[in-house]
UniProtKB/Swiss-Prot annotation:
Pathway: Purine metabolism; AMP biosynthesis via de novo pathway; AMP from IMP: step 1/2. Gene3D superfamilies: Adenylosuccinate Synthetase, subunit A, domain 1 (3.40.440.10), Adenylosuccinate Synthetase, subunit A, domain 2 (1.10.300.10), Adenylosuccinate Synthetase, subunit A, domain 3 (3.90.170.10). This is Adenylosuccinate synthetase. The gene is purA. Binds 1 Mg(2+) ion per subunit. One of its GO terms (molecular function) is GTP binding.
Amino acid sequence: MSAVVLVGAQWGDEGKGKITDFLAEKANCVVRYQGGSNAGHTVEVSQEKFMLHLIPSGILYPETLCVIGNGVVVDMGKLIEEIDGLQKRGIDTSNLRISLRSPVVMPYHKRIDELEDRHTRIGTTKRGIGPAYADKINRIGFRMGDILTGGECFRERFKAQIEYKNRIMEEIYQEDGFDYQQMLNEVLGQAEQLKKYLADTSYLVYTAIKEGKKVLFEGAQGTLLDIDHGTYPYVTSSHPIAGGACVGTGIGPTNISKVLGVAKAYTTRVGEGPFPTELNDFQGEILRDKGQEYGTTTGRPRRCGWLDTVILRYAVRINGLTDFAITKLDVLDSFSTIKICVAYRYKGQLLTEFPNNIAILDDCEPEYIELPGWQEDISAASSIEDLPLNARAYVAKIEELTGVKAAIIAVGPKRKQTIVNSPLFT
């Protein structure tokens, strides 16, 4: 059995797409287990960049089964656009499968998300993700299978839901409502286009694992954005953590063999919320510019700061990480001195564990250690021995502070710019 869960160990944008793409070459099956079109993965292959939002990064390998699990909320229009975009570039999408249980992001979810964000200022992507998950929990949402097999029952439920959403639009937001027939036609048309991809994906993935195939579970966002274990309320509406892989695909935890945490060699965050190691100076600008820290989905500039190992230790605990993949080590090439946060200082007290309260986190000051930089280009390194001594010492310090080995080190965006210290798939 070889089933690996890949999770973001920070606030998302850790480079999961690149690592997933790299591992997918050896995987028989790649599975997305949560999130929606709010996620953004950039994969660079042969001088081409592919920006994926819903489709697993393994789609670039023609022999790899790619699964969108039941934990993913599906914007059918965006998914069709993504499929069409890949096909126009010569990518075969026939190996894609979508769970019949996947909740659907309706047009009204996106409009309500946009209106609600004006008041909450949580900094959502306005893709309708939160409202879609809310309807799922309230048991008033629609699944992919409902639309195609529901018939008159679906139409009646959908009409009632439009009437309900229209009351919300008119009475709460003082906005015009939605046209039932127009939206019904749109939704049914999109579902028909995706019909050939629908399947009982839990059974497909379970069978693949039992047959000894290599399965990679691909998370979106990151540990600190988890709805329960992240910096609430500045979080996403799903479970990016390793436990979410089981719930979001219908696979039991005993089927998982390894959990890989992807972490940048520094830290970034998008949107609102506390960020203890944030750099609001020229060093932060260097990280942003060299790391091209702009959101794949929104284009928003990311907030940048030094590596925070308090966060990483928290990710180790929450996810049960067995290995790390350290990405964008090359972004630190120009620094003469590099800082690592090892603890927080809160009202005179030293905190080595991540606080549960964001009000406390917001008042925390980082406690740093300093390491000498290497100040040379490492983008051509293909083994740990190729790295300068100071770069190796930096990685070793991360391993020491977290108690987890770095199985993978990325020194650039391309597949070949990846150092493997220990194989993930056996």
